[in-house]
Amino acid sequence: MNNSTNSSNSGLALTSPYKTFEVVFIVLVAGSLSLVTIIGNILVMVSIKVNRHLQTVNNYFLFSLACADLIIGVFSMNLYTLYTVIGYWPLGPVVCDLWLALDYVVSNASVMNLLIISFDRYFCVTKPLTYPVKRTTKMAGMMIAAAWVLSFILWAPAILFWQFIVGVRTVEDGECYIQFFSNAAVTFGTAIAAFYLPVIIMTVLYWHISRASKSRIKKDKKEPVANQEPVSPSLVQGRIVKPNNNNMPGSDEALEHNKIQNGKAPRDAVTENCVQGEEKESSNDSTSVSAVASNMRDDEITQDENTVSTSLGHSKDENSKQTCIKIVTKTQKSDSCTPANTTVELVGSSGQNGDEKQNIVARKIVKMTKQPAKKKPPPSREKKVTRTILAILLAFIITWAPYNVMVLINTFCAPCIPNTVWTIGYWLCYINSTINPACYALCNATFKKTFKHLLMCHYKNIGATR
């Protein structure tokens, strides 16, 4: 943001410009917005924490954005409401500078997080074979930390120490604004750097994302689907682990992965799904043989370039003799970050030995790989991510644009912006923090369901909500 108050407010009388009923109305509306902002962003953070299906790299960026929005809801909204209804700043220059530093650092961090989300999605769509291998949780954490540190360095020192740099504090008593914004050129420059430039970058990135997605959809419709070559049982290299207390996993992630190669070796670049590939896998405690096809990119599987991976694991039930096999078919030519996979669950009888089980595993794999790939539409999860990003960007532009337009006008004509209009424009920037959680819920069914479970105190199986 830029300019905490309209520079034309100099000499403002230390009395409230509003009548009593207006003050009550402003406090009720502002207080409600603050409360909704706090609750909404806490829901986002808790949802990502408790639901493993939301623990993805993309959602970690949303978690960081929710942290920034939460701080705005707790501090910025309420202090600005106080400043507005009283008509002057009653907390002194030190608290004023601390509030401004916090407000601008957090607001800039929000913009930086939006840029990160846009770049992340852009690289996922345009570099599906090279970017995913770099797209790790550690990398995401470093990018998020860099966004916050850079925002702090850009704003906090200048806001807190500018008066000492120039040798005098020019902000009048009873007012609270950034001192170096008295310079019109600086105000204009910061508005460009803090809003207009990021908006241009994000708009261009989203245009490329949309164009790449549409291009892939057209390609999918035109290209015929090649049937998969059957996998010979002799190529199946698996090891059945006897179910005992030592190797029974205590969590859903404990699976052994043994690969069956058909054609070329898999490329490391497609080991992670840019959309929701970080979701954890779980074995099913079923009592019958079942095959669940979840091929999200079957139409891109080629005849001579595919990799079939099997995952062998056991049920958590100590008395179970089940064997769970997961077949993941990954394509080398796919321009999507989403690998195809087929999950097969095999239940062995208690009398079967290891060789018999292995033969059954081989036959089941051969049977599944003989099936021709079916034409599927583009992954719905990919659409969810893209739709969520679009909603967030639109909300950001719509809520921040009025204020930043007024900033430029105020640079050349300070009396042209009425104080009430200025206050509304400034508040719209804050309302963006209220809208963001609603964008997640409306565009992502998993977020919506998790929100509902949390609000209704339905905690059973909340970690597996999809």
Swiss-Prot record:
What keywords does the record list, in alphabetical order?
Answer: Cell membrane, Disulfide bond, G-protein coupled receptor, Glycoprotein, Membrane, Phosphoprotein, Postsynaptic cell membrane, Receptor, Synapse, Transducer, Transmembrane, Transmembrane helix
Q: What's the short name of a Pfam family annotated to this entry?
A: 7tm_1
Please state the gene responsible for encoding this protein.
CHRM2
Listed as disulfide-bonded, the cysteine pairs are: C96-C176, C413-C416
Residues on the membrane's Extracellular side span: 1-22, 81-97, 163-184, 411-418
Write down the species: Sus scrofa
Per the entry, what this protein does is: The muscarinic acetylcholine receptor mediates various cellular responses, including inhibition of adenylate cyclase, breakdown of phosphoinositides and modulation of potassium channels through the action of G proteins. Primary transducing effect is adenylate cyclase inhibition.
SUPFAM superfamilies on file: Family A G protein-coupled receptor-like
User: Looking at the keywords, is NADP present?
Assistant: no
Q: Which residues lie on this side of the membrane: Cytoplasmic?
A: 46-59, 120-139, 210-387, 443-466
Glycosylated at which positions?
A: N2, N3, N6
Please state what the protein is called.
Answer: Muscarinic acetylcholine receptor M2
Q: How does it assemble?
A: Interacts with ARRB1 and ARRB2. Interacts with RACK1; the interaction regulates CHRM2 internalization.
